[in-house]
Design a protein with these regions (language model features):
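Feature for exported/extracytoplasmic and membrane-associated proteins, marking the mature portion
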Residues: 2-336, 355, 373-444
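Active-site lining segments that contact anionic ligands and/or coordinate catalytic metals
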Residues: 290-292, 339, 347, 365-368, ...
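Histidine-centered active-site microenvironments of extracellular/periplasmic hydrolases
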Residues: 348-379
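Glycine-centered coil/turn sites that cap beta-strands in beta-rich domains
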Residues: 446-487, 509-514
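Short, glycine-anchored, charge-dense loop/turn motifs used at functional sites
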Residues: 488-495, 522
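C-terminal tail/sorting-segment detector
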Residues: 501, 505, 511, 515, ...
Length: 541
């Protein structure tokens, strides 16, 4: 059989035993979970940074003297004679962006996103007993299962399991639009499940549309031989895959990118990730109902020539490409009006060791930093700053559950807050009860949400009595309901209940006393039923 595109139709082929004479489309195949956003237009973009991103030279503790001491050649220095090569402070914190994330980037890059409330920085992400093999650690991150035991085979991703659970009739009923879409390569384990692949991978969209799918030009075979049966069966599978070609082609032709945002540059300084994000933006603009997109950027295995004393090198170039891609996408999404429907998350299999090596590079390490972007993220820094006094026997930053963030908490937050799942749903998908890190707000309120779209996602904090220790939380409910407001610190640890009561419809202002809490960023989470809204509080003493 001739295969004429880069389409990976594994969602179909993986379900070989059950695919005969089955319908392709379904009006509403969701049944197993009560995930509110899965059945609306909420979208997740995951950017995989393969190679192990150096978090310490991405979000930088410049004011810690030990940082420069252990990285004399590759550190980013505040006194660089070239102002464009100096680190850029994040809000009023003591952490800094690498200048490549800001300077020379579309609309000031990550600084512009942070100032606009569209970027969350999540420090110290990782897992206990880290595995420093690229492939095993990548499998751990993509599977959502924390196991470094090589005997434990990891064959499916947390996204694949999420959709497997949400689409109980799959593969007997196939959604009209692909659930997941990967740009380039063969389909990632992230999008695979026990029921088969829950998405497809394509290369260049123009070629994908031009080539027209995967089915053969040859007719069905006659006869009842085993060969004929298998041939005709495989051909029918590919023909069903062609239906996805048609909906992608329609979205591609209907969609657009905002004039003046040049996603077309596929090489050079901006690189292929920019092109991938432009493709995703255009498909969303054109009405494709895919729920999860996966983009990729490699090259982060920076053992040599990571960066020189002038901040030139492989790592700054990659960070510049990442910042351009995300910033251009968000600009396009805002201008086209779909920004409130989309969040994005970066993932990288591990970080780098604090000490530079002898080749102006760094070796495999443990924890790193991840980014979440979108209009529905909590724009702040989550997690504790790196502690150079607490290194393990390999000289890596030690993973401490009291200070670091289990990477699965990022996924649990997506499952529960973005896709509306319950704690039990999250447990089923991640195979463990994982407390979500509250870095997201719910999608724009549905008609069933009793919290009005008031201020910052239905919940707003104001410091009305001119004291850093006190203020008010404001919100409005459109019907009588029970409301709980909880407080979490920047690590996502529960810090106390602020309110727990049944209230009547209308506007409410709840006094908040923060005098017993230390300085820092806190998250207030308002919940009622399955709906959650969050806002941040900054305490300065």
């Amino acid at each position: 059989m001739k295969r004429r595109t880069l389409l990976k139709a594994g969602a179909l082929a993986g379900a070989a035993a059950s695919f005969r004479s089955i319908p392709l489309f379904a009006q509403n195949p969701i049944g197993a979970l009560g995930l509110n956003a899965i059945d609306n237009d909420a979208i997740l973009i995951i950017i995989q940074m393969f190679g192990g991103n150096d978090g310490l030279n991405t979000i930088i503790p410049v004011d810690d003297p030990r940082y420069v001491q252990i990285r004399p050649n590759i550190s980013v220095k505040k006194d660089n004679v070239d102002a464009t090569k100096r680190p850029v402070r994040i809000l009023s914190s003591d952490m800094y962006f690498h200048p490549a994330l800001v300077n020379g980037v579309h609309k000031n890059g990550f600084l512009g996103l942070m100032d606009a409330g569209r970027l969350a920085v999540i420090q110290g992400t990782g897992y206990e007993n880290p595995n420093l093999s690229h492939f095993r650690s990548t499998d751990i991150w993509l599977s959502g299962l924390n196991t470094s035991d090589p005997a434990n085979r990891l064959n499916e991703g947390w996204v694949g399991r999420m959709f497997e659970k949400n689409y109980p009739e799959f593969p007997m009923v196939i959604p009209e639009h692909p659930l997941c879409l990967q740009l380039g390569g063969s389909l990632s384990m992230l999008l695979q499940s026990d029921k088969g692949d829950m998405g497809l991978a394509i290369g260049d969209v123009d070629s994908f549309v031009k080539d027209g799918g995967t089915s053969s030009d040859s007719p069905m075979m006659g006869g009842t031989s085993n060969y004929a049966n298998e041939y005709n069966y495989i051909r029918s599978i590919a023909a069903k895959g062609d239906a996805y070609n048609k909906v992608i082609e329609e979205a591609w032709k209907k969609g657009t990118n905002t004039t003046g945002i040049d996603f077309a540059i596929a090489n050079g300084a901006k690189g292929s990730l920019v092109r991938q994000m432009g493709i995703i933006s255009r498909l969303i603009s054109g009405g494709l109902k895919t729920k999860v997109y996966l983009a990729n950027i490699g090259g982060f295995d920076t053992h040599v020539q990571q960066q020189d004393t002038s901040n030139n090198g492989q790592h700054p170039a990659l960070l510049n490409q990442l910042a351009n891609a995300v910033s251009m996408f968000m600009d396009d999404a805002v201008q086209q009006g779909f920004a409130n429907r989309v969040i994005g998350l970066t993932v990288s299999e591990f970080g780098r060791r604090p000490y530079e090596n002898g080749s102006n590079g760094t070796d495999h390490g443990t924890t790193s930093v991840q980014f979440a972007f979108g209009t529905r993220v909590q724009a702040n820094i989550f997690g504790a700053n790196p502690d150079f006094s607490d290194l393990d026997r390999n000289g890596d930053l030690a993973f401490d559950m009291n200070r670091n963030i289990d990477y699965r908490r990022l996924y649990s937050e997506i499952i529960q807050t973005w896709f509306g799942g319950s704690t039990d749903d999250s447990k089923d998908i991640l195979k463990d009860r994982v407390v979500p890190l509250p870095y997201l707000q719910s999608p724009i309120a549905s008609l069933n949400d009793p919290i009005m779209n008031y201020g910052n996602g239905g919940l707003r904090f104001s410091n009305d009595i001119a004291s850093s220790n006190s203020g008010y939380l404001h919100f409005e409910v459109k019907k009588n309901c029970h409301v709980t407001i909880r407080l979490y610190d920047s690590l996502g640890k529960f810090a106390g209940n602020l309110f727990d009561s049944y209230i009547i419809a209308g506007n409410h202002s709840i006094p908040v006393d923060m005098s017993v809490h230390a300085s820092g960023m806190y998250i207030c989470e308002l919940s009622t039923g399955n709906f959650r809204h969050t806002t941040s509080i900054i305490v300065r003493k």
